[in-house]
């Protein structure tokens, strides 16, 4: 009986050991599957220069959230507030595949592609709906072809309107910038302002606050959104905003992606990105329309004087632009006249 009990105990022990090994093997297999699944998930890095309250961050977040909800093993990590690249240095790494996505004022890349300077041409865009039509026109297709040469594609189209600020006085017409140290966002605006005898200091909109504070700048123009995001109302005496009637300053600020990176994704991942981008683009247009009026309230609440551009002021700026920015663009860009004509043809 003792021998039998010993054998029974030995069998039970062996069975217990076998079960332990099976359980451990199962746990290891599940863990390995989890690691494999995580390894299959693709992470994309998206860079921009604004805070997480800015409309352009919100556009990026809509795309990131939409892709996450699609559950296609694709994650978009957003690096805002110029934490990954300096604002004017994002297009080149994007084109080289060192950066996956960015929300960028395209005229910042005018050094790489001079045609991009047309995306901030004074008086070219009439209003937000006109901007949306430009984004769907042969003119934009021509610009997208140039982006494709750099291995870049557009995911989300978007234009923002903007205005002027003066540190010590209001700016409505060309005579008001005579002798002022002024910031403009792109080459075409710089050329126009130089034609009005302003001195030009080039910088990203994220640098306007410090430049105003230290006396480097007397005046600046940028988008209504950036004026608020960067708290420029703390440094100026007067704000001339864009209105429904007169918006001299309209800037194309799309969400871009490296083309090869997009093409390397699965069909499900590509479709998820495009669906999220479509939703973000609709949001961008509707919110962009609200930014101008919202910025006026912020500046008013801060005690800043609000000035208005008259029809005569607008016409004077546009006449100056045609003699400076427009002529120089056509002279500097080989197909500049064709691109300008395509843009002007959009009703």
Regions found by a protein language model. Name each.
Residues 1-18:
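Short, Lys/Arg-enriched N-terminal segments with co-localized hydrophobic residues
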Residues 8-11, 26-27, 51:
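A periodicity- and composition-biased signal for non-globular, repetitive helical segments
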Residues 9, 32-39, 222, 226:
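Residue-level recognition of conserved structural "scaffold" positions that shape functional pockets
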Residues 15, 42-130, 139-347:
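N-terminal secretory/targeting leader peptides
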Residues 19-40:
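Gram-negative bacterial Sec-dependent N-terminal signal peptides
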